[in-house]
Design a protein with these regions (language model features):
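Q-loop/switch helix immediately C-terminal to the Walker
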Residues: 92, 99-111
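Helix-to-loop junction immediately C-terminal to a conserved catalytic motif
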Residues: 55
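Conserved ABC ATPase signature
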Residues: 137-141, 145
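Catalytic Walker B motif of ABC-type/P-loop ATPase nucleotide-binding domains
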Residues: 162-165
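H-loop/switch region of ABC-family ATPase nucleotide-binding domains
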Residues: 198-199
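Conserved catalytic motifs of ABC-family nucleotide-binding domains
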Residues: 158
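Conserved beta-strand-loop-alpha-helix hinge in the C-terminal portion
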Residues: 217-251
């Protein structure tokens, strides 16, 4: 624990650009070890981008966020990518909904950066320490319980520094103060260096040891002495006013021709198209590598595989395809017999041969085609929705903070689930026909 207390964060000559906009320029700062540092700034100033950068979610020199500079945790200089030295408590918690609270914490324990030492606490002990019930599913937990679970999972990964992303966003004053007390209690009990990123300075300043101000006008971060903390609201307002289109910029924009504005918009759209196309081509080129079944932990790959098997080949998928098969078989047989020429005379003579032909066509042609289309439509939509929820809820970013290649626990299990479930579903729809 003494190592965690002494671990400080030093940033030198940091430059950050996002979508062509300069967010930070030549920033150098020091976060003291074992303290709570609060970083305040206006909305859209780049606070969350900085947090994701420090957490290792944003690799160096890759679109859409480009950054350069030196990061040093204690005596160790870090280049880029997830490094296990920082843990992040996301604004939306980024908990794995398909796992129990105990499994969420155990996931972090099993993916610690340094597994040469035994974990400090078991998953159940972490839940008990943070006051999180283990029985209810994650979706049934209250907002406060989810936040405590997110903190427990972050601590279980044994990071040196804990990052908090807007922990009081959207909360009323009373709840915000309870969250601030929870952060302070966590820091005192576990003695981890903490960086809290927020625009709610009024709630979080009372727990701060140090305060940093992100000046969006000058694209820098400055330390605010304690005797100037009362001036933070005015300094934030001043920075926001200076950043909101100076008069000279408005004059220049108003005198520009329609062709100039349209040309810039077209160039930006074309650049975005080329960027998206390049990213898609890179993803296609990397598919054989990303789909190679190498996973950090076979146990957890199996858990994710089981989750996607439930989406692709679960009871609802089976019922859906069986009903579709019954409908297809019934309609094919009915309309074939219904519209036979001279049905009264030919049906008794051709019934056996006709049914055999219908069965052959269904099993050899229609069933595989129909099953493939239905599986692609229903199961593909289910998987896409699940991955979309993981992206929106921050779960994919949470995987990155644990140093996990996202294809290992997403792409590989999804492909495996389709390979296992598709033949079973096609057999079921054929059986229904």
């Amino acid at each position: 624990m003494s190592e965690a207390v002494s671990t400080a964060l030093t940033i030198a000559h940091l430059n950050v650009r996002a979508a062509g906009t300069e967010l930070l320029r030549d920033v150098s700062l020091h976060l003291p070890g074992g303290k709570i540092t609060v970083l305040v700034g206006g909305s859209g100033a780049g606070k969350s981008v900085l947090l994701r950068l420090l957490a290792g979610i944003l690799p160096r020199g890759q679109s859409p966020v480009y950054w350069e500079g030196d990061l040093r945790f204690g005596d160790a200089a870090l280049e880029s990518g997830s490094h296990g030295r920082t843990g992040i408590v996301f604004q939306q918690f980024a908990l794995f909904d398909e796992l129990t609270p105990t499994a969420n914490v155990q996931f972090a324990i099993d993916h610690r950066a340094d597994r040469s030492q035994p974990p400090r606490y078991s998953s159940s002990e972490w839940l008990e320490l943070l006051g999180v019930p283990s029985a209810p599913p994650v979706a049934a937990l209250s907002g406060g319980q989810k936040q405590r679970l997110a903190i427990a999972r972050t601590l279980a990964a044994d990071p040196d520094i804990i990052l908090y992303d807007e922990p009081t966003s959207g909360l009323d004053a009373a709840t915000g103060h309870r969250v601030a007390e929870l952060i302070q209690e966590t820091q005192r009990r576990f003695e981890r260096t903490s960086l809290v990123v927020t625009h709610d300075y009024a709630t979080l300043l009372p727990i701060a040891d140090e305060v940093l101000l992100l000046d969006s006008h000058n694209t820098t971060i400055v330390s605010v002495p304690r005797d100037q903390w009362s001036e933070i609201p005015e300094r934030l307002k001043a920075a926001a006013m200076h950043s909101a289109s100076p008069a000279s910029d408005r004059t220049t924009a108003s005198t520009r021709s329609w062709w100039g504005v349209t040309g810039d918009a077209t160039a930006n759209a074309f650049g975005n198209f080329l960027g998206a196309t390049g990213a898609a081509l890179q993803a296609i080129a990397r598919l054989p590598i990303d789909a190679f079944p190498i996973v950090p932990r076979l146990r957890w790959a199996g858990r994710f595989l089981w989750h996607f098997l439930g989406l692709i080949g679960g009871p609802t998928a089976c019922i859906y395809l069986v009903v579709a098969g019954v409908i297809a078989g019934f309609t094919t047989t009915y309309f074939t017999l219904r519209f036979l020429p001279f049905r009264l005379y030919t049906q008794p003579l051709l019934i056996d041969e006709l049914l055999a032909a219908i069965g052959f066509a269904l099993y050899r042609i229609l069933v595989p085609i129909l099953a493939t289309v239905l599986i692609a439509a229903r199961c593909g939509a289910a998987v896409a929705a699940d991955v979309g929820v993981k992206q929106y809820g921050g779960q994919i970013d949470a995987l990155k903070t644990f140093g996990i290649r996202t294809p290992a626990y997403l792409l590989v299990p999804i492909l495996g689930a389709f390979l296992i479930a598709t033949p079973i579903l096609e057999w079921l729809i054929g059986l229904a026909d």
